[in-house]
Amino acid sequence: MNISNKIGIYPGTFDPITFGHLDIIKRACKLVDKLIIGVAENVNKHTNFDIRLRTSMAKNEVKGAGIDADIISFNGLLVKFAKEQNASVIIRGLRAVSDFDYEFQMSWVNYKLFPEIETIFLPASEDTQFISSSFVKEIARLGGDVSNFVSKSVQSELINLNRVENGE
């Protein structure tokens, strides 16, 4: 299925980007002619990595996976960013029913703000459905192995983050 001549936005904080995000990105690319990964600077959400590093990690991971997508950081309303990018589709990944409740509400609000922009929900693949950036950061913080969830370069950034947080 290809939504002809469509630009899609896959937004997130990507703090950090995980294999779950990459799974959605790969699948989203099949649905639109152009995919923009919007790295959000959300003032209401604490992030461990700054916007430049999150954007850089996303660019490296997407390029390393051989995915053709643009990575752009943004702040403010998602639908405003989508409109600025001439996107007509917002793509959101869903891991669990709890994600759906929140995402469904957000899609309704976005529709009310800009009805010309649709939201598409992609369920996480079976092997990525329980990966979250929060879980990955917690596992790394506690010294666990996160190699099943993120790339080696992201693992290195998590190690650096933990060193900084521990005053090393």
Curated annotation (Swiss-Prot):
The keyword Cytoplasm applies. It is found in: Cytoplasm. GO terms for biological process: coenzyme A biosynthetic process. GO terms for molecular function: ATP binding; pantetheine-phosphate adenylyltransferase activity. Its main location: cytoplasm. Disulfide bonds: none annotated. CDD domains: PPAT. GO terms for cellular component: cytoplasm. It catalyses: (R)-4'-phosphopantetheine + ATP + H(+) = 3'-dephospho-CoA + diphosphate. InterPro entries: Cyt_trans-like (IPR004821), PPAT (IPR001980), Rossmann-like_a/b/a_fold (IPR014729). Reversibly transfers an adenylyl group from ATP to 4'-phosphopantetheine, yielding dephospho-CoA (dPCoA) and pyrophosphate. Belongs to the bacterial CoaD family. NCBIfam families: coaD_prev_kdtB, cyt_tran_rel. This is Phosphopantetheine adenylyltransferase. It comes from Wolbachia pipientis subsp. Culex pipiens (strain wPip).
